[in-house]
């Protein structure tokens, strides 16, 4: 059985990296875990002995047959043949109470759908996941992983950074070279761990914050003030920027998350143009 390009399949074969992914999940015997895209079960085989229940979601019908043949007799394993992005797993689990409400996620996901999967797992700034996971360990493209953990004033810092860091703490576990996969991808990969959590001081108007971030990074070469002029008069923006110690020449990537939240809270008192 060969990986299918249309599903973005690259199977992880490096045993050390597989062990690092499982270690990063910090599994307990009572854990219920969600695995997205199990492939041929390289991670599955390591997860099953350590958890109470493992729900694996796989879109590839042939791989589902393979997984059922090799793991279908395990009492703590349940396979759902479905597109994770289009499926409400809770609807499927009504007759399987042992697998309901998984609290941890471990997955080697197709790189071309990383953004949508992150959004489904975490929610959005204005609509966060109402039942957040305890931890999410993902193997993703390094370029995207760098953006998740980026700091202000760096090239990787951007809208995705803010959207994810508003909802979760993010850290890099390890870098994964192309040779760790079959077939080899053309890019480096990285294992990241996300721990969803509420902010101590969330935005007063999360929808406005999401809008500001979108507009603020609409043209990264422009100064933030100039991007936001499409929403607010400079007479409103300038004194607020000064109060928040944001330079009039600052670009979006030079403003940290707390400053973005403070900016949103201040602008919440004014109608958009």
Curated annotation (Swiss-Prot):
This is Ribosomal RNA small subunit methyltransferase A. Specifically dimethylates two adjacent adenosines (A1518 and A1519) in the loop of a conserved hairpin near the 3'-end of 16S rRNA in the 30S particle. May play a critical role in biogenesis of 30S subunits. S-adenosyl-L-methionine binds at residues 10, 12, 37, 58, 83, 108. GO terms for molecular function: 16S rRNA (adenine(1518)-N(6)/adenine(1519)-N(6))-dimethyltransferase activity; RNA binding. It is found in: Cytoplasm. InterPro entries: KsgA/Erm (IPR001737), rRNA_Ade_diMease-like_C (IPR023165), rRNA_Ade_Mease_Trfase_CS (IPR020596), rRNA_Ade_methylase_Trfase_N (IPR020598), rRNA_adenine_dimethylase (IPR011530), SAM-dependent_MTases_sf (IPR029063). Keywords: Cytoplasm, Methyltransferase, RNA-binding, rRNA processing, S-adenosyl-L-methionine, Transferase. Its EC number is 2.1.1.182. The keyword rRNA processing applies. GO terms for cellular component: cytosol. It is an enzyme of class 2 (transferase). Signal peptide: none annotated. It comes from Picosynechococcus sp. (strain ATCC 27264 / PCC 7002 / PR-6) (Agmenellum quadruplicatum). It comes from the Bacteria. Belongs to the class I-like SAM-binding methyltransferase superfamily. rRNA adenine N(6)-methyltransferase family. RsmA subfamily.
């Amino acid at each position: 059985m060969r990986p299918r390009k249309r599903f973005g399949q690259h199977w992880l074969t490096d045993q050390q990296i597989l062990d690092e992914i499982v270690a990063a999940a910090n599994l307990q015997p009572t854990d219920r875990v969600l695995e997205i895209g199990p492939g041929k079960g390289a991670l599955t085989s390591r997860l099953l002995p350590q958890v109470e229940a493992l729900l694996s979601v796989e879109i590839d019908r042939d791989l589902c047959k393979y997984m059922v043949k090799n793991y279908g007799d395990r009492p703590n394993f349940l396979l759902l043949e479905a597109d994770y992005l289009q499926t409400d797993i809770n609807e499927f689990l009504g007759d399987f109470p042992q697998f309901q409400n998984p609290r941890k996620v471990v997955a080697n996901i197709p790189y071309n759908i990383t953004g949508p999967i992150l959004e489904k797992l975490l929610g959005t700034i204005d609509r966060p996941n109402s039942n957040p996971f305890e931890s999410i360990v993902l193997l993703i493209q390094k370029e995207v992983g760098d953006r998740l953990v980026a700091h202000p004033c760096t090239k990787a810092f951007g809208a995705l950074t803010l959207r994810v860091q508003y909802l979760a703490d993010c850290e890099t576990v390890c870098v994964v070279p192309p040779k760790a996969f079959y077939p080899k991808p053309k890019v480096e990969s990285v294992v990241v761990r996300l721990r969803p959590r509420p902010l101590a001081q969330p935005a007063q108007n999360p929808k406005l914050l999401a809008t500001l971030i979108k507009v603020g990074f609409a043209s990264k070469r422009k100064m933030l003030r100039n991007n936001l002029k499409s929403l607010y008069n400079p007479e409103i923006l300038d004194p607020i920027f000064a109060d928040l110690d944001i330079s009039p020449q600052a670009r979006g990537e030079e403003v940290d998350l707390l400053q973005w939240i403070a900016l949103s809270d201040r602008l919440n008192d004014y109608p958009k143009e």
